[in-house]
Amino acid sequence: MINTKFFLIFCLIILLKPIKSFGLIEVDITRGNLNPLPVAVSPLSIDTKSKKSFKELLKKDNVGSEISLIVENNLKTSGLFNPLSKDAFLQAPDIANLKPRFEDWNLIKAQALITGKVTNIDDKLRVEFRLWDVLAGKEMMALAFTTVPNNWRRVGHIISDKVYERLTGEKGYFDTRIIYVAEEGPKTKRVKKLAIMDQDGANNKFLTLGNELVLTPRFNPTNQMVTYLSYFRNLPRVY
């Protein structure tokens, strides 16, 4: 067995209690011919000092924009949301996060708005985000996460899950990983390796060297272990 448990500790801070009702925004995922919900994903704002420090740590020009892009792509690929072009945004990210001008977001037909900011606190990545109901002019949810900088991609997936669940009522699936058997080499001598990746295809890693045949990998739902079939001295074994 291979332990794939990630020791990621998030400090989840509820800034404001989410309103109990869904307001005017509802995404019905049970009916056919669904019109995706127009959503504006504003780039997460970041102060100059934090931007510079994270650029050195992560080799990213703007980690706030990178996290926002992950959220945008996740929502789009779900088929339930239509992220609007940032070229149409009328309000700067830092101002929108403090107090959105809902008339501006209504003007570009956004029904939901996601804002937030990124800061460096003692070399930790702190990400705050807010979900707004543009039609009702209300905040729906506000959360914050603190983690090590290298977990910035996962923060984007977790935000996506929170937004998805808040707007659809169904649990999100973006912060998940896929275990699979990768094949390479010529047709007459294929090499199979156990591999794992994020659900969006990022962070692909090989878990075995390809010295032995591997088949049928499965996640254990209780302890986050991976079980797979392999052959040792031509005998099948479960690992």
Q: Each predicted region: which residue ranges?
A:
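N-terminal signal peptide c-region/cleavage motif recognized by signal peptidases
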Residues: L16-P18
